[in-house]
């Protein structure tokens, strides 16, 4: 993710050899409503600041061009939810031989996009086994995380498929509608905490 531009400068003192430097003027963030501000962490501020760079002025002239570039990894902006914005303002300062300065501000506007939540689980937590006549229940859990810090994911469940085999392990066994409904109804999940962007969901399979 990048953008770039340039500014030009000139000094009427023909023997001056101006130099360019940069400084961060301000960095602010707003929620998607466009008016509610929120704080950025030190790491986020560092990433947003370090993304701005300028070229070096050629030293043998009293006038010239300074190119600026803003380049940041998409992963460094994952904390922004859809339509949240960051406004980063930087100063490019031209300084001559007599320490006289001229300043040009560069404003970079960044708009967030929605990032999908990520699910993680070990194999023993996403597979269950029960045997008729003994244990008739099993359980496990999965974890989830959403990089959009103000997102509040919810969880739902549905049945992808139900299949049955005879004792030989290969011959399909037809289930009645009631049997299939009972098998599906035995699966349930917990409700995740709605006050966080990450957490865990417990699942249970229990059949009579």
Residue ranges and their predicted role:
Residues 70, 114-121:
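Proline-centered linker/hinge motifs at extracellular inter-domain junctions
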């Amino acid at each position: 993710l990048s953008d770039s531009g340039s500014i030009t400068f000139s000094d009427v003192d023909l023997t001056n050899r101006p130099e360019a430097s940069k400084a961060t003027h301000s960095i602010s963030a707003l929620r998607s409503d466009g008016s509610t501000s929120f704080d950025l962490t030190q790491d986020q501020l560092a990433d947003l600041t370090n993304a701005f760079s300028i070229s070096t002025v050629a030293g043998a002239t009293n006038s010239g061009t300074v190119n600026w570039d803003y380049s940041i990894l998409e992963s460094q902006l994952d904390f922004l939810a859809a339509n949240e914005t960051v406004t980063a303002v930087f100063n490019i300062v031209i300084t001559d031989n007599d320490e006289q300065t001229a300043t040009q501000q560069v404003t970079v506007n960044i708009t967030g996009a929605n990032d999908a939540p990520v699910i993680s689980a070990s194999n023993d937590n996403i597979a269950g086994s029960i045997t008729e006549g003994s244990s008739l229940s099993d359980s496990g859990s999965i974890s989830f995380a959403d990089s959009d810090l103000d997102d509040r994911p919810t969880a739902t469940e549905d049945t992808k498929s139900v299949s049955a085999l005879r004792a030989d392990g290969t011959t399909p066994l037809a289930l009645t509608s009631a049997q299939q409904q009972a098998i599906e109804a035995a699966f349930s999940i917990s409700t995740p905490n709605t006050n966080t962007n990450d957490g865990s969901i417990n699942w249970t399979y229990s059949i009579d």
